[in-house]
Amino acid sequence: MSETFDVNAAIYPFPARPVPLDVDQKAFYREKIKTLLKQRDAVLVAHYYTDPEIQALAEETGGCVADSLEMARFGNNHPASTLLVAGVRFMGETAKILNPEKQVLMPTLNAECSLDLGCPADEFAAFCDSHPDRTVVVYANTSAAVKARADWVVTSSIAVELIEHLDSLGEKIIWAPDRHLGNYVQKRSGADVLCWKGACIVHDEFKTQALAQMKALHPDAAVLVHPESPQAVVDMADAVGSTSQLIMAAKTLPQKKLIVATDRGIFYKMQQACPDKELFEAPTAGEGATCRSCAHCPWMAMNGLKAIAEGLEQGGVMHEIHVDEQLRQQALIPLNRMLDFANELKLQTKGNA
């Protein structure tokens, strides 16, 4: 598999974590959010990687906790006129693409994603133009502009099936932006894949040596790995899958101990799914390195209670997602192709973002 545009050396401008709230402040903002949701005819949709208290509030108020695509689909089916998306910016954009008639708010518009940042639309378009014979498949973790340039959008839960399908048609693929997931689907499918060289700052930090040491401490534990992780880490897994697939694996695997290599935000729903099991965070860094994300996306951490309340209360340019209508229509085409493909396979599309 060929690769290009190595962004390993990129120094992303990590945001400051929200100032911790005390018990009284948390209670105040929870009640304020509940009131504002009713006043604005809004529903709170949160990603699996947000902090547990945010996921709990989404459930308590009739919202949902899911991956980025399911968040958008939930918003489409929910009667609320406003969606408050607790996640990162591309998730808000996806919600707006699929729900143009609704107001989409976010706690902050500065919640980025290293995969999105590592795939600038102009550079990616030029790269695609230089390989006109290839079908362009992009991961959901991309901007609206990158989606608009693609032939297909895909989530990790159906990535292998889609690439196998395209390969059976004799098509050669451009895959973007995650090189580890691209490598995973190429190995599984055997397709001709030209891969953009992006990476998730969280999953890229999992290391085999540290994981092997933890496995030695817990030899009876199963290892669950998201395919955005390096191939050597994936090779150590008992189960590989998207966020939703890892939660399902946690329920169905016989082991009572689970070592989980993905963002630790997933532990909230995973522990709900299997309360009788013991969960361990897979180690990040190791092998002489220090962790930067330390198994939690710094941009997901921006979705605090105070920020959610401010997003609902203030709206406007600081919190509302807008997508150019022409761009939205272009991005909707590959998104709908993915949804149609998933329906034909009789799969419920649940990816990672």
Swiss-Prot record:
Q: In which pathway does it act?
A: Cofactor biosynthesis; NAD(+) biosynthesis; quinolinate from iminoaspartate: step 1/1
Keyword tags:
4Fe-4S, Cytoplasm, Iron, Iron-sulfur, Metal-binding, Pyridine nucleotide biosynthesis, Transferase
What domain of life does the UniProt record list for this protein's source? Bacteria
> Matching InterPro entries, A to Z?
NadA, NadA_sf, Quinolinate_synth_A_type1
Q: Where does iminosuccinate bind?
A: 47, 68, 139-141, 156, 226-228, 243
- Cofactors required: [4Fe-4S] cluster
Q: Give compartment(s).
A: Cytoplasm
Q: Which SUPFAM superfamilies would you find in this protein's record? A: NadA-like (SSF142754)
The record's free-text note on cofactor binding: Binds 1 [4Fe-4S] cluster per subunit.
EC numbers listed for it are: 2.5.1.72
Residue numbers binding [4Fe-4S] cluster: 113, 200, 297
Keyword Transferase part of the UniProt annotation? yes
Q: Name one Pfam family in it.
A: NadA
What Gene Ontology biological process does one annotation of this record name?
'de novo' NAD biosynthetic process from L-aspartate
Which GO molecular function annotation, any one, does this entry have?
quinolinate synthetase A activity
> Reaction catalysed by this chain?
iminosuccinate + dihydroxyacetone phosphate = quinolinate + phosphate + 2 H2O + H(+)
Report the sequence similarity comment from the record: Belongs to the quinolinate synthase family. Type 1 subfamily.
Role of this protein: Catalyzes the condensation of iminoaspartate with dihydroxyacetone phosphate to form quinolinate.
Q: Which protein, by its recorded name, is this?
A: Quinolinate synthase
Annotated source species: Yersinia enterocolitica serotype O:8 / biotype 1B (strain NCTC 13174 / 8081)
